[in-house]
Amino acid sequence: MGFKFLEVIKPFCIILPEIEKPQRKIQFREKVLWTAITLFIFLVCCQIPLFGIMSSESADPFYWMRVIMASNRGTLMELGITPIVTSGLIMQLLAGAKLIEVGDTPKDRALFNGAQKLFGMIITIGQAVVYVMTGMYGDPSDMGAGICLLIIIQLFIASLIVLLLDELLQKGYGLGSGISLFIATNICETIVWKSFSPATVNTGRGTEFEGAVIALFHLLATRSDKVRALREAFYRPNLPNLMNLSATILVFGIVIYFQGFRVDLPIKSARYRGQYSSYPIKLFYTSNIPIILQSALVSGLYVISQMLAIRFRGNFFIGLLGVWEDVEGGGPARSYPVALCYYLSPPESFFSMFLDPIHGLLYITFMLGSCAFFSKTWIEVSGSAAKDVAKQLKEQQMVMRGHREKSMIHELNRYIPTAAAFGGLCIGALSVLADFIGAIGSGTGILLAVTIIYQYFEIFVKEQAEVGGMGTLLF
């Protein structure tokens, strides 16, 4: 049945544009160039406003998700990577649950990737329609059908560009994946901007700079009481401060430290005597996948909640999912404490837990539980479970030292499921910690940025080992 499903959608997959695999080995310098070009195109799209929108100044219900989903409100990158991540999540879960069957042949894998791309485009259209019809860019009746259609087309084309850029890197022309690159860039851009932004903000204390570092020097230069100026630079409310920046650096260090935790299982060649190696099982076995899936889940819930809240305002059951209110100044939309979306969003600060401890406890439980669950589930649907690793080692004619071939799965099962679940739990705990201590860019965003940067570091090290020397790599 699953095979028939993929065959049915095959004619539709053909009409989608596709990046061909390189016919030759791409040199490292070329990969760096293509990665830079991809990033440049993405950043340009982040700055081009959507044509035809009447307003994007209303409260933003997806404020907390934008950094993680690499989206920028009111621009071509409005949807960011959300359609790609959502389609990939759903297709992987369907394949893992055996609802659709995907073989190991290149033809089946290509068909599955095409179906994932097609599903992503369908999600893009659906999400764009929801955004337009719920009034995110103005009243649809005032804009007219033509302008509404034009906005949907712009969002569709922009998402297609993102999909092709991601495919370009994944096919081997660049480094890593487009999704990871865009997420890390968006998060790092947010951190740098909130640290060094020269923009000024009028507060009750006078005009201040938005950037935490620039604000420090400005306060020291303009305040006569230097001790008070330092205190204000470290603890000023409602604007980035040096405590936020210090918390961000602390979380970076903690995540990098935990990245080094792993168990090396000794393996040897079944064909050649004396050839020994090791198979590493990291603490973060599934890397940043749990937090990405958790973010996609919450983002989808926000979209549904916002749409239903607008269409069925005042409905009691819809209100249980999320009742949204606008914050003055076009700030992020928030939900009332009676709504589910409120309890799935991070508290404002650690001290907010004392004002509403139920919110804090439910948020912690949700983060830890969902990350552990997604991590444990992902190894089953992505081909990285114990049985899959044992199969890979067998194909490479490698066996674990001290164990027969048949007992490898049992030995791997002692480590891999535990590493996946506990690693996901640690990812969730670090995200909660970063949220509570006020790290810039949200706890989830910091974790994604660090893990992605670490992945790119490993790619550089691997390329260096293959080519030899950093000077050879770059010059």
UniProtKB/Swiss-Prot annotation:
InterPro entries found in the cross-reference section: SecY/SEC61-alpha, SecY_CS, SecY_dom_sf, Translocon_Sec61/SecY_plug_dom
Subcellular location field: Endoplasmic reticulum membrane
Pfam families for the chain: Plug_translocon (PF10559), SecY (PF00344)
Tissue specificity comment: Expressed predominantly in epidermal cells of the embryo.
Main location: endoplasmic reticulum
Record has Cell wall biogenesis/degradation as a keyword: no
GO biological process: pronephric nephron development; protein transport
This protein's UniProt keywords: Developmental protein, Endoplasmic reticulum, Membrane, Protein transport, Translocation, Transmembrane, Transmembrane helix, Transport
Domain of life: Eukaryota
One Gene Ontology cellular component: endoplasmic reticulum membrane
Homology family: Belongs to the SecY/SEC61-alpha family.
Assembly and binders: The SEC61 channel-forming translocon complex consists of channel-forming core components SEC61A1, SEC61B and SEC61G and different auxiliary components such as SEC62 and SEC63. The SEC61 channel associates with the multi-pass translocon (MPT) complex.
PANTHER family, per database record: SECY/SEC61-ALPHA FAMILY MEMBER (PTHR10906)
Identification of the protein by name: Protein transport protein Sec61 subunit alpha
